[in-house]
Design a protein with these regions (language model features):
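GNAT-family acyltransferases
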Residues: 1-104, 109-112, 125-129, 133, ...
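Conserved beta-strand-loop-alpha-helix junction that forms the acyl-donor binding cleft
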Residues: 141-151
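A generic structural-conservation signal
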Residues: 122, 139-140, 163
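Conserved active-site tyrosine of GNAT-family acetyltransferases
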Residues: 154
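Glycine-rich acyl-CoA binding loop
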Residues: 117-120
Length: 187
């Protein structure tokens, strides 16, 4: 991705990662011509990225960016491992904070890169970025009760586990609802 690309100015760098808000051209390429994604990003893209959960969200996300270009940063972020210059996961939000200042975060690290601390490193950096915006008051996460790696990430972030929630799309499935308020963030 060129330095003149709109998403370049929002990059977040951590010791091992570069987080980039997914630009419209990458979202559209992923939907319509996946072979172009690596070229646009200037990074390696695993073939199994097309099978990740974020793919279902990309059409809605692309439309969100078309309707409101200032939404860049409040949707999908791409997690690039800098040493290999490879996409290793994605994370992000479902849009800008709502009227009450709440926002939901989600994340996924590809299987080959799990249990190496990348998830926490990325989520912590994105949480810090999000809470640098005064309109954000509360961050929400939903996590399957058996996803111990994600539970550890949420606990390390200082998120508070609230209660179990039913998943309407998946009968007999429950997830934990978590929250982090701006007052809990060390500034």
């Amino acid at each position: 991705m060129s330095k003149n690309h709109p998403a370049s100015s929002l990059q977040i760098k951590t010791p091992r990662l570069k987080l980039i808000p997914c630009p419209l051209d990458v979202a559209e390429a992923s939907i319509f011509n996946p072979s172009l994604v690596a070229e646009i990003l200037g990074a390696g893209v695993p073939k199994d990225w097309q099978k990740t959960e974020v793919q279902d969200f990309l059409p809605m996300y692309a439309q969100m960016l078309v309707d409101d270009p200032t939404s860049l940063g409040w949707g999908v972020w791409l997690m690039i491992q800098t040493q290999e210059n490879t996409l290793i996961g994605d994370l992000g939000f479902g849009g800008k904070p709502d009227e009450s200042g709440s926002l939901e975060i989600g994340y996924e690290v590809f299987a080959a890169y799990r249990n190496q601390g990348y998830g926490f490193e990325a989520v912590q950096a994105l949480v810090n970025w999000a809470f640098s915006h005064p309109e954000l008051k509360r961050l929400i996460a939903h996590c399957p009760i058996d996803n111990l790696a994600s539970v550890r990430i949420l606990e390390k972030l200082g998120m508070e586990r609230l209660h179990l929630v039913e998943v309407p799309e998946l009968p007999n499935t429950q997830v934990w609802k978590w929250q982090l308020r701006d007052l809990q963030i060390k500034k």
